[in-house]
């Protein structure tokens, strides 16, 4: 019964998780929160992660009831992500692996999301909508790879939402996306915004540029409220995501859809995806914020699968890769 300790820190979340044989034993997490109207810089984010990671490690061990002797493998996020935070976490993972004399496994962040989603929901072979601050992809498993059937051709959907939040100076606590979601519930008017889908790919830079350009003028003239803009942006970008997911499901002949990534815990997105799945006679699988948002347990779970399949990351190859494609990884742990 191998137990794996996972470190995640590719963006503004830092987490340490423990997984043993399909059970999440611990999953503490911290978030680097910046003032309204601002984003998070790599150097500042890395300093935050370094300041709290050892406390999180101790918290994870205490919560799991395990000691270093009980851990069989150390997993860490190899990429993709922001360089400085990734490096900070990788250094700690390497150090712990050497101090405890444990094997090390570098995990693709995107695959961590997928494996956690499969574990928690029980989805067997879904078409995956992976939506976060750094990634937007439609993925399906085929011949030992998680194949990307569609993706953003510019910025991620979460990045679009976050940057819009800066325009209105919406709070980043607990996250700009969550606060947009709450404001959107009070929106009454649907403002027409650019809608860009190309096959199974999407583009969000145009809709962001448009809404950045018109937001203050429309608010100043009373054409709409901030809540209306949040509602309109959500409805438009989520409709784009539902469309490309349905197209991928039709292409793959899939009867399951799984939403993963930080944006995936948005209830409105889940509602729209559920409607599409219901009309297709398919099932929707999604998780809550404990497992959708970046966390250490998802890295531990993917690391657990990889460890059991014989994967090991030598110290000489234990760096990070900021641009690490989902389909670069050979998925040897699945049939």
Swiss-Prot record:
It catalyses: L-threonylcarbamoyladenylate + adenosine(37) in tRNA = N(6)-L-threonylcarbamoyladenosine(37) in tRNA + AMP + H(+). Keywords: Acyltransferase, Cytoplasm, Disease variant, Epilepsy, Intellectual disability, Metal-binding, Nucleus, Transferase, tRNA processing. Its main location: cytoplasm. One of its GO terms (molecular function) is N(6)-L-threonylcarbamoyladenine synthase activity. It comes from the Eukaryota. It is found in: Cytoplasm; Nucleus. Changing residue 14 to F: In GAMOS3; strongly reduced formation of a threonylcarbamoyl group on adenosine at position 37 (t(6)A37) in tRNAs. The keyword Translocase does not apply. One of its GO terms (biological process) is tRNA modification. Its cofactor is a divalent metal cation. Substrate binds at residues 130-134, 162, 177, 181, 266. Binds 1 divalent metal cation per subunit. SUPFAM superfamilies: Actin-like ATPase domain. A divalent metal cation binds at residues 109, 113, 130, 294. GO terms for cellular component: cytoplasm; cytosol; EKC/KEOPS complex; nucleoplasm; nucleus. Changing residue 198 to R: In GAMOS3; reduced formation of a threonylcarbamoyl group on adenosine at position 37 (t(6)A37) in tRNAs. The keyword Acyltransferase applies. Component of the EKC/KEOPS complex composed of at least GON7, TP53RK, TPRKB, OSGEP and LAGE3; the whole complex dimerizes. Interacts with PRAME. This is tRNA N6-adenosine threonylcarbamoyltransferase. The lineage of its organism: Eukaryota, Metazoa, Chordata, Craniata, Vertebrata.
């Amino acid at each position: 019964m191998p137990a794996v300790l996972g470190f995640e820190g590719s963006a503004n979340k830092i987490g340490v998780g423990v997984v043993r044989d399909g059970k999440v034993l611990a999953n503490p997490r911290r978030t680097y929160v910046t003032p309204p109207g601002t984003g998070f810089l790599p150097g500042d984010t890395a300093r935050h992660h370094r300041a709290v990671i050892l406390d999180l490690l101790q918290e994870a061990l205490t919560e799991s009831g395990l000691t270093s002797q009980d851990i069989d493998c150390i997993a860490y996020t190899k990429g993709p992500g922001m360089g400085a935070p990734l490096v900070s976490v990788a250094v700690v993972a390497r150090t712990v692996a050497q101090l405890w004399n444990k094997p090390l496994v570098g995990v693709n962040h995107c695959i961590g999301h997928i494996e956690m989603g499969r574990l928690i929901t029980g989805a067997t072979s879904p078409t995956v909508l992976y939506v976060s601050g750094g990634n937007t992809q439609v993925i399906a498993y085929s011949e030992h790879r998680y194949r990307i059937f569609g993706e953003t051709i510019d910025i991620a959907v979460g990045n679009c939402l976050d940057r819009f939040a800066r325009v209105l100076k919406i709070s980043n606590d607990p996250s700009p996306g969550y606060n947009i979601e709450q404001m959107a519930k009070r929106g009454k008017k649907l403002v027409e915004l650019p809608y860009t889908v190309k096959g199974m790919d999407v583009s969000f830079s145009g809709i962001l540029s448009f809404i950045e350009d018109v937001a203050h003028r429309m608010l100043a003239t009373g054409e709409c409220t901030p809540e209306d803009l949040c509602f309109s942006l959500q409805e438009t970008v989520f409709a784009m995501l539902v469309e490309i997911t349905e197209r991928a499901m039709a292409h793959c002949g899939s009867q399951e859809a799984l939403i993963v990534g930080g944006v995936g815990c948005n209830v409105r997105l889940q509602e729209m995806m559920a409607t599409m799945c219901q009309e297709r006679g398919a099932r929707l699988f999604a998780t809550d914020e404990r497992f959708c948002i970046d966390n250490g347990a998802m890295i531990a779970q993917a690391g657990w699968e990889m460890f059991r399949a014989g994967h090991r990351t030598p110290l000489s190859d234990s760096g990070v890769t900021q641009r690490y494609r989902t389909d670069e990884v050979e998925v040897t742990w699945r049939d």
